[in-house]
Amino acid sequence: MAARSWQDELAQQAEEGSARLREMLSVGLGFLRTELGLDLGLEPKRYPGWVILVGTGALGLLLLFLLGYGWAAACAGARKKRRSPPRKREEAAAVPAAAPDDLALLKNLRSEEQKKKNRKKLSEKPKPNGRTVEVAEGEAVRTPQSVTAKQPPEIDKKNEKSKKNKKKSKSDAKAVQNSSRHDGKEVDEGAWETKISHREKRQQRKRDKVLTDSGSLDSTIPGIENTITVTTEQLTTASFPVGSKKNKGDSHLNVQVSNFKSGKGDSTLQVSSGLNENLTVNGGGWNEKSVKLSSQISAGEEKWNSVSPASAGKRKTEPSAWSQDTGDANTNGKDWGRSWSDRSIFSGIGSTAEPVSQSTTSDYQWDVSRNQPYIDDEWSGLNGLSSADPNSDWNAPAEEWGNWVDEERASLLKSQEPIPDDQKVSDDDKEKGEGALPTGKSKKKKKKKKKQGEDNSTAQDTEELEKEIREDLPVNTSKTRPKQEKAFSLKTISTSDPAEVLVKNSQPIKTLPPATSTEPSVILSKSDSDKSSSQVPPILQETDKSKSNTKQNSVPPSQTKSETSWESPKQIKKKKKARRET
């Protein structure tokens, strides 16, 4: 009974302990789930009590084992830390006691190094540092003797090197001082210094000035050429006033001027041939037209300076005077010395000028006129060219002109007759203008060639114009009035001014804007014919009458150019050759 009771009590206690352990495990697992989110998948209620007891016992043993192991490791580490300092001291004390010879050798090596550094003080015997040892002292006594025996030549060598270095440094310093004194002219030691006299200094200064002046002139030669080309128009009879002063740079200027004068004829030829690359209107380049118009509007009543044709190709830069343009170099002595009031080119500038609306057009109006059609009222009445003939009561007709073809033929026949006389007059004017300059045989030959080429070109022009008129008259009568009158105005210009036709017909007029008018050129031909009529009045009066008729009938050109103004490439080449020969 007693034995059973002991076992029963033990079983009861085990069950109670297992129940507590189950509760604790369940609480712990719930804590892990709720707080840490760990689900181990254990359910302590399913397991029997003895399993729980065995597991808890095993865990307890593991914990005890881990705690004991950690404690033992901590204790071992503490013991090692406590025992390590005395061991190091014992080792440090045992090393010198074990090897005294090594210490002596180290000391000897150190002493030798110090002796090498301090060789100047080696006359005295060095004493060994540290403790005195018999072996060490013997070695120390032996080494100084050998060192003292070897040191004197080395010391001498170093002293010599130091002396050489000092000498070199002194010589370098002297050279630097000498170079600074003599302004870059190095003077060697021991060399004789040559003194320069005042006369030589003056000559050297003159040479330096000449060099600087020549350098500046060489750099400004293009500017000098430009100024000379501008001012040569005033120097038709006078010489260039540069050589008045005998300065050092004047020789270059005189040479430049002489070269320029000698090559003046060539330059005019180059300029005139260069016009073949530009389209021409009134003898000038088309690219220059807008510039001319804009500047002429702002100029007011400005005068044309009388310039001989030899100075053609150079333009003045003064805004108050107008000289002959490069494009007008080969127009056979046009009268450029007339005032604006007599010129009648630009309306609104001169008081008696003919009111032409095109003369005051600006670049903007050129562009606008391409898109806007012309109005007949602008070219009729007081706004048109009828002011040249105050008795005319011409107005723009609404139907085709019936008698206009006959007038054209008659005017062409009349205008073709006095061509040689007009040519003679223009050639005489050109000879007068060129007579002012000093000319040679070469220029006279050029004049003769010009006359021959121009006579040939005028004859060719008249024949070609007659053919073109015969071909185009039936076509023009059926076309609109502006086209007919534009072709006629071009033909009258070509018959009255053959040299101007050379300039105009030397290039195709394809790229000209369609809205450009030929009215200024018509008026120029009128002014030239006025001049020629004043010189040869009985011959050229008929041409003036025909031109007045053409001016009354002149109309702004339409958008499409008439085909009468075109020429074949062979004719253009012939005219170019004639111009080159001139």
Swiss-Prot record:
One of its GO terms (cellular component) is cytoplasm. It is found in: Endoplasmic reticulum membrane; Nucleus membrane; Cell junction, Tight junction; Nucleus, Nucleolus. Interacts with BCCIP, CREBBP/CBP and RELA/p65. Widely expressed with highest levels in muscle-dominating organs such as skeletal muscle, heart, tongue and small intestine and in endocrine glands such as thyroid and adrenal gland. Overexpressed in various cancers including breast, brain, prostate, melanoma and glioblastoma multiforme. It comes from Homo sapiens (Human). The modification Phosphoserine is found at residues 180, 216, 251, 298, 306, 308, 311, 323, 339, 344, 369, 415, 426, 457, 478, 494, 496, 568. It comes from the Eukaryota. This is Protein LYRIC. GO terms for molecular function: double-stranded RNA binding; NF-kappaB binding; RNA binding; RNA polymerase II-specific DNA-binding transcription factor binding; transcription coactivator activity; transcription coregulator activity. The keyword Signal does not apply.
